[in-house]
Amino acid sequence: MPNFIEGNLKADGKKFAIIVARFNSFISDKLLDGALDSLVRSGATDSDIDVVRVPGAYEIPLIAKKLAASLKYDAVICLGAVIRGATPHFDVVVNEVSKGSAQVSLETGVPVLFGVLTTETIEQAIERSGTKAGNKGSDVAIAAIEMANLVDALQ
C-alpha cells in the first residue's frame, strides 16, 4: 500500500496573508468575506490573518512576492475580479496575474493561491462570489490551509 501524504484543513497555528484588489470591490469584498469565514471556521484567529489591499489585480504579484519572501506567512491568498470588457486588457491582466502569482509560489516555496475571478460577465462574477456557484474566496482559503499543511508535511 503506498504512503499517501496530504494536507489537513486545520488553520490553527498558521499565518495567512490575503491580498485583495480594490477594483471591482463589490465582488472582491465578498470573496474576502468568504475567505475570512473559512479561515476562522478552520481555527485561524484574527491575529493570524493580515489583509493587504492593492489597487487592482495587476498589482497582486508584486505584493504576493513581498509577503511570501518575508517568510512570515504559511500561505498567501490572492483575491480579485477581472471581468472581460471590449478591449484586450482582460487577457493581459489575467495572464500576468496568474503567471506572476504562480511564479512567486515556485520561487519562495510559500503556497500562493489564485482566487482572482476571471469572468466574461458581471453576472458570472456575482455567482462565484457567494450566490449560485458558491464563494470562490472560501474555496481558495480552504485550499490555502491544505497547502500550508501539505508543505509542512513534506519538510
Curated annotation (Swiss-Prot):
GO molecular function, one term: 6,7-dimethyl-8-ribityllumazine synthase activity
Known EC number: 2.5.1.78
Keywords, ordered alphabetically: Riboflavin biosynthesis, Transferase
GO BP annotations, alphabetical order: riboflavin biosynthetic process
Residue numbers binding 5-amino-6-(D-ribitylamino)uracil: 23, 57-59, 81-83, 114
Keyword Transcription attributed: no
UniProt-listed Gene3D superfamilies: Lumazine/riboflavin synthase
Positions of (2S)-2-hydroxy-3-oxobutyl phosphate binding: 86-87, 128
Catalytic activity: (2S)-2-hydroxy-3-oxobutyl phosphate + 5-amino-6-(D-ribitylamino)uracil = 6,7-dimethyl-8-(1-D-ribityl)lumazine + phosphate + 2 H2O + H(+)
Catalytic-site annotation from UniProt: 89 (proton donor)
The protein's enzyme class: transferase
Family matches, as InterPro entries: LS (IPR034964), LS/RS (IPR002180), LS/RS_sf (IPR036467)
Gene Ontology CC: cytosol; riboflavin synthase complex
Pfam families, A to Z: DMRL_synthase (PF00885)
Pathway(s) this gene product operates in, as recorded in its UniProt entry: Cofactor biosynthesis; riboflavin biosynthesis; riboflavin from 2-hydroxy-3-oxobutyl phosphate and 5-amino-6-(D-ribitylamino)uracil: step 1/2
Similarity comment text for this entry: Belongs to the DMRL synthase family.
Function: Catalyzes the formation of 6,7-dimethyl-8-ribityllumazine by condensation of 5-amino-6-(D-ribitylamino)uracil with 3,4-dihydroxy-2-butanone 4-phosphate. This is the penultimate step in the biosynthesis of riboflavin.
Protein name: 6,7-dimethyl-8-ribityllumazine synthase
Organism name: Desulfotalea psychrophila (strain LSv54 / DSM 12343)
Chain's gene name: ribH
